[in-house]
A protein has these predicted regions:
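Conserved helix/coil segment N-terminal to the catalytic DExD/H
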Residues: 73-92, 96-115, 129
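Pre-Walker A (Motif I) flank of P-loop NTPase domains
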Residues: 2-7, 33, 90, 146-147
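Conserved nucleic-acid-binding Ia/Ib motif block in the N-terminal RecA-like helicase ATPase lobe
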Residues: 38, 43-91
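Hydrophobic anchor at the beta1->P-loop junction of P-loop NTPases
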Residues: 7, 37, 151
């Protein structure tokens, strides 16, 4: 019953199956009754159309709702059914872009607050920017989840700083820093710059990476 895990697994090694197996085990133990799965817009429907149906054991009854900013009647009914009382394992599938919108945040918050849920972010580098609205929203919402998971083959795509927000979503205490800026100051070589009358900090190199 580990509360948080990062599945840093290369493409093709079965991240989706590992997550769904974990969800099934937690559901079987009575630890959760729902899962909120978040993925990039181009692939998030794969979870409802392929991954869950392929890997979730047939003996587990399930309800699946897929988020859409402009839902059809069928989509609306599927999401509403997630809030009905039942013994089914309930999945809400959302694209990460939804968390830049008030409507998307409200839907996810209601789902997490009314279920014992696992929250998973597929391709978690989509939340690597700590200043992005969707990152801030997801980190805040994750506190309402009973369990948290992130999935990606490459957690660092441009800079060691990429890792902070991903791990912060799992547990803000894991890295041992009180804020992104303290993390940045410890691992980055930061200089003050100015442009157009505005000053800002810029990372020009890295240090302490051997830790």
């Amino acid at each position: 019953k580990q509360r948080e895990y990062a599945y840093f697994m290369e493409m093709g090694t079965g991240k989706s199956k590992v997550l769904i197996d974990n969800i099934a085990i937690l559901y079987g133990k009575g630890a959760i009754n729902a899962a909120l799965i978040i993925a990039p817009k181009g692939v998030y429907r794969n979870w409802s159309e392929r991954e869950i149906e392929t890997h979730l054991p047939d003996c587990i009854s399930r309800r699946i709702g897929v988020w859409s900013a402009s839902p059809r009647k069928k989509d609306q009914e599927a999401i509403l059914s997630l809030f009905e009382v039942s013994e089914d394992l309930k999945f809400l599938i959302m694209n990460v872009e939804a968390f830049s919108t008030k409507k998307g945040v409200i839907c996810a918050q209601k789902f997490l607050q009314t279920h014992n849920a696992l929250l998973a972010v597929d391709e978690s580098t989509t939340i690597k920017n700590p200043k992005a609205a969707r990152t801030k929203a997801l980190v805040k919402l994750a506190k309402h989840a009973s369990f948290r998971r992130i999935l990606t083959g490459f957690p660092i795509t441009q800079s060691p700083m990429d890792i902070y927000s991903q791990v912060d979503l799992l547990n803000p205490n894991l890295l041992g820093f009180s804020s992104y800026y303290s993390f940045q100051n410890h691992y980055g070589q930061v200089v003050n710059r100015s442009f157009g009358g505005r000053s800002f900090k810029q990372v020009v190199g890295y240090r302490n990476l051997e830790e």
